[in-house]
Amino acid sequence: MGNANIDESDLKILEILKKNARTPYTLIAKELKVSEAAIRKRIEKLIRQGIIKRFTIEYELENEIRAIVMVQSTPQIPTPEISKKIAKIPGVEVVYETTGDYDILVIVRGTNITSINRTIDEIRSIQGVVGTNSTIILRTWF
């Protein structure tokens, strides 16, 4: 990833898109005091460099439960291998490889505690997972 070519304008564009990926290029251009074409070129460059990986949404449904699952793995199986398997499990929203007591942090989503438990059980069944610690998300702030 070529982060060396990132300047303050690129960082500002990323910050705007992070808050709302649907922000029109014209509004970004107005805020940065440049042309819409300049914004379009910068965003295309950020995509090409792999800095912008995807445009997505954050959502929260009523009566939906989200949890953070911290996963300990065994050193005998590479963490990326375990992470890729976890990412394929239904109900898994995102997987992070981390440092500290836990090697992997997983955000899971479900319609009830039973579905959350099912997802956690599936994570625990993956070869190389030696332990988990879970916590329910009460609120999300953006």
Curated annotation (Swiss-Prot):
Residues 6-69 form the HTH asnC-type domain. SMART domains: HTH_ASNC. Residues 25-44 bind DNA. One of its GO terms (cellular component) is cytoplasm. The keyword Cytoplasm applies. Pathway: Amino-acid biosynthesis; L-lysine biosynthesis via AAA pathway [regulation]. In the absence or at low concentrations of lysine, activates the biosynthesis of this amino acid via the alpha-aminoadipate (AAA) pathway. This is HTH-type transcriptional regulator LysM. It comes from Saccharolobus solfataricus (strain ATCC 35092 / DSM 1617 / JCM 11322 / P2) (Sulfolobus solfataricus). The gene is lysM.
